[in-house]
Amino acid sequence: CIRDRIKIKPERSKTDHMYKIGTWIRDNTQGIGTMTYVKGTSFGGLGHGIYDMDTGTLLKIKGGLLLDPQIYSIKKGKSGTPGEIVGSIEYKEENILGSIKKNTEKGIYGTIPKKQQKAYKIGYRQDIKPGKAYILSNVSGTMKQYEIQINKIVPSDKDVLKSMEIEVTDKELLKLTNGIIQGMSGSPILQNGKLIGAVTHVFVNDPMKGYAILMETMLYEMEN
């Protein structure tokens, strides 16, 4: 049970002249996305924030759970209609991977107790080059590397969620998803063996293309 105290200023009704308040309580929200990295016992994921579907504002959260979802199918993307990973989330103890502590414009962050196996060096903006790179995704049910192309590195004074323009070139992934689909946000991007960023957005009119955030941006957001 979560309790909180807030201050509300009542407004006088124009109809019956009584003081009233209006409340809108959102109990929880859920969705499927990708955990990007683990550093020690902390993690970062999504690469962008979780927003209220009705108001379009960034959700202020008390906390949350990182869970292992059940994936049923893949809906391929097409021009004008983003695809998606179709699945469900069961709130069972065995599905809990970690705890979400904060939801920011640059991703979700929290803690995770499990030790991870493979470690990557971090690639910073100056290390990134246009050309071949890879994304890590388990969209097929197994974690795999898929080839992509970094088409453009966007200047640092622009939208940090769109720091790189990327394009899926891997034939296997294109056959499976037709490009970037909802649920792949947060998928790690590797270049020259270094972790350089994460997928954030898909081009609505071209699902093969999308945007990515830099890893240095997510790490800074987690630590500050």
Model-derived features with residue positions:
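A cross-kingdom feature marking charged/low-complexity
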Residues: 222-224
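Serine endopeptidase catalytic core focused on the charge-relay Asp
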Residues: 7-178, 182, 191-192, 200, ...
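Conserved small/polar residues in nucleotide/adenosyl-binding loops
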Residues: 1-4
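Active-site rim segments in enzyme catalytic domains, especially the processed small/beta chain
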Residues: 185
